[in-house]
Amino acid sequence: MERFLRKYNISGDYANATRSISAISPQWTCSHLKRNCLFNGMCVKQNFERAMTAATDAEEPAKAYKLVELAKEAMYDRETVWLQCFKSFSQPYEEDVEGKMKRCRVQLLEDYRKSGMMDEAVKQSALVNSERVRLDDSLSAMPYIYVPIKEGQIVNPTFISRYRQIAYYFYNPDAADDWIDPNLFGIRGQHNQIKREVERQINTCLYTGYKGRVFQVMFLPIQLINFLRMDDFAKHFNRYASMTIQQYLRVGYAEEVRYVQQLFGRVPTGEFPLHQMMLIRRDFPTRDRSIVEARVRRSGDENWQSWLLPMIIVREGLDHPDRWEWLIDYMDRKHTCQLCYLKHSKQIPTCGVIDVRASELTGCSPFKTVKIEEHVGNDSVFKTKLVRDEQIGRIGDHYYTTNCYTGAEALITTAIHIHRWIRGCGIWNDEGWQEGIFMLGRVLLRWELTKAQRSALLRLFCFVCYGYAPRADGTIPDWNNLGSFLDIILKGPELSEDEDERAYATMFEMVRCIITLCYAEKVHFAGFAAPACESGEVINLAARMSQMWMEY
């Protein structure tokens, strides 16, 4: 391969196409209908290596260039290329897959330094809590910011607590007859008194040790209090509470419209659209008047998801008023996965998702109808059937497939997903990392990308593998800000032609090895054992990473 490329000075996209077709040629299935695959009486797609060797040995540049043109032409049909790649990669070769993986790891570590990702990792603040909680806007704690009142007065508390700057005001929802906007002038004095009293009685946050001021209040059902003593429950619920307060603080500002569209898919006219959406009267089949009342009056269980507002089901109710009963049923039965509920309980194969940020970056619509796939753990992400321009995504613990019509859209959609769900710490062997490589491989092979887009894709590969690797001082970079993360990925330096060619080869090889390993583990081909990550190699890689940080 390298001899052929160097002898005839093949570079750039032509070299990438030649490498790709050569790798999958042994398993390619060609119908020969168009006859454009024939070269010297044989099918190039099925016998590319043989044709390449013949052209090299015969020293016929014209035939070599014709061969390269055929490879480039074959890459235009990206759907066929993806299918042929997936078929080829899922059939283990007689090769040293483990050795190839190690070489890819070392090359990517070098690319991590050269691509600018290590520069950016140095600039990031240190991650305070390494147990990252993955948040998405399919769930919300927004109902709990609204003030419960009885005969014009705030309902008395039964218990108080705090999480950092947020006062937790526990009360009995049955004692309330309405819920109102916390910014109303008539209750500001009482609202401020609650903050001062919680700050006076509870000087230190029991969860984090924070000792600062209390600035906001969340009104929580008393039934929730025992579950907040469970570490995992509290970790997730507290983070959603914090995210909700950040959204609430945008009320009255320009960003409010953006948040409302992201959560509800529509923005009502008039002032304070968030409060309108939460408090306006809905046609529920029960006595509940608003979304806030419907959520607060229904208790959850030991699953933190069962206490939050399921925004996908809410949007179903907004689009189809007869489906408001789905929201009541979902919360009454304490379901935890909205996509499972739609797919299995309601026999709905699709649902709507909203991504305002991706829309701003690509110019496409923020509204998408996606196909609901399997729940995480039920089947491997590698088994999800992707056709045409589909890419895999995830809401909570459930996969879906969405259509991406351009390479830029696929790249940004995948980057947002990876930022939320994938954490690469340098030493990998878990399914999350494999999922990230698979998704990036789909973008690399299915869509025609520019050199700038492939440069961004390489930075994503580096992030998936090394983004959360400890720095020289032992701290871990904090990549939690999605906006700055996308700026780093999409606006980084563009690779030179030689760097692009080498990066493509590394990414292609890594994707091939990962899919091969996944299918080897699942199918257990005779005579092929999936390699394990040996401790010696792990130590060597960790030492190499540590040395790079020290040199840096």
Curated annotation (Swiss-Prot):
Superkingdom: Viruses
Entries under InterPro entries matching the protein: Orbi_NS1
A Pfam entry, by short name: Orbi_NS1
Entry protein name: Non-structural protein NS1
